Amino acid sequence: MNHPQPITMPIPGHIDPVPVPRDLKPRVDGRIDLLGLSRDDLRMALETAQLEPRQAKLRAKQLWHWIYNRGATDFAVMTDIAKDMRGWLDQRFVVSRPEVVEAQVSTDGTRKWLLRSDDGQDYEMVFIPDADRGTLCVSSQVGCTLNCRFCHTGTMKLVRNLTPAEIVGQVMLARDALGEWPSQPEGRMLTNIVMMGMGEPLYNFDNVRDALKLVMDGDGLALSKRRITLSTAGVVPMMARAGEEIGVNLAVSLHAITKEVRDEIVPLNRKYGIEDLLQACADYPGANNARRITFEYVMLKDKNDRDEDALELVRLIRKYRLPAKVNLIPFNPWPGAPYECSDPDRVARFSDLIFKAGISAPVRTPRGRDIMAACGQLKSAAEKKSRAELDRMAAEKQAALG
């Protein structure tokens, strides 16, 4: 079989290549969005609006409960706050949600939302229901700088980082859609979060960290760090910091075990090689047999799926004494993709070789392929549909809501 010649991709740039200003900027209507603010920033926003410090502390506590525990977006429903104070808040502040441009449901129950920011940037999130859990796949950037050749998002240019409000807003919107307010630890559909949507989370470290701290706060969304996984293609200098400052589970987009192949399909490898990446995994704070590091490995026909590749992967995991499991991902096709998925028998053989070495290597069942929501298929629909068409859809949605 003839393969396309490898294309030399630019090596991704420095950390946080598109910084987002962290000062509070009013919306077009002059109001400040409270979503995404830390407790201290929420209190400071009230003080800046001339509320005296003692009042600001009390109101911040009440607002926190209504925003993150009850899911409120309207100050009028916050009944333990005096009516005149609710009016005062409504004049100065807002609790936002991302704009939903399009919502799709797969035949397997997977849901995908196309979202649009205030400045007109589009990004996607996906909810994957299972019998024992429900996982929300969250985006961290509009586009991506990594250029991974098997990934649809990698064909997009990086536009900008998502803000903490835009990241946590995806979780809030999913809770809205699932009817899961007030927040409660038992019986909810949204049980897990994976930072595996559009973008490289560690190239937007501060905003991802701040958003996940909101998600993990016990007085609000209250999702345990053990139910959150952050995926990186291998931004080695930021991995230890992620473990120390966020402390969630780590997944690594490995996908190849030779320099030649990984340089081609994950260009970041030319900056941070496999050996350095695996050492960073070995040093990751909190990794142990109860909290294993997940290695993601997309199965590409005649590219990375030989028996020798499986055995070398086992050798490397043992060499670095990594508490690890391997997720084997059948390649999910997208228009113009340069690869094909490995044959099912080859995937099964690859998995079996790793299992026989005592390392868990399940094959992930593709979910949401029919709506381009599966792993590696996300791409802003603004690049697949005309802006006029998207605007028309948004207008029709608004008209339907009255």
UniProtKB/Swiss-Prot annotation:
It is found in: Cytoplasm. One of its GO terms (cellular component) is cytoplasm. The active site is at residues 124, 375. GO terms for molecular function: 4 iron, 4 sulfur cluster binding; metal ion binding; rRNA (adenine(2503)-C2-)-methyltransferase activity; rRNA binding; tRNA (adenine(37)-C2)-methyltransferase activity; tRNA binding. It catalyses: adenosine(2503) in 23S rRNA + 2 reduced [2Fe-2S]-[ferredoxin] + 2 S-adenosyl-L-methionine = 2-methyladenosine(2503) in 23S rRNA + 5'-deoxyadenosine + L-methionine + 2 oxidized [2Fe-2S]-[ferredoxin] + S-adenosyl-L-homocysteine; adenosine(37) in tRNA + 2 reduced [2Fe-2S]-[ferredoxin] + 2 S-adenosyl-L-methionine = 2-methyladenosine(37) in tRNA + 5'-deoxyadenosine + L-methionine + 2 oxidized [2Fe-2S]-[ferredoxin] + S-adenosyl-L-homocysteine. Its cofactor is [4Fe-4S] cluster. Its EC number is 2.1.1.192. Keywords: 4Fe-4S, Cytoplasm, Disulfide bond, Iron, Iron-sulfur, Metal-binding, Methyltransferase, rRNA processing, S-adenosyl-L-methionine, Transferase, tRNA processing. Reaction proceeds by a ping-pong mechanism involving intermediate methylation of a conserved cysteine residue. This is Dual-specificity RNA methyltransferase RlmN. It comes from Rhizorhabdus wittichii (strain DSM 6014 / CCUG 31198 / JCM 15750 / NBRC 105917 / EY 4224 / RW1).
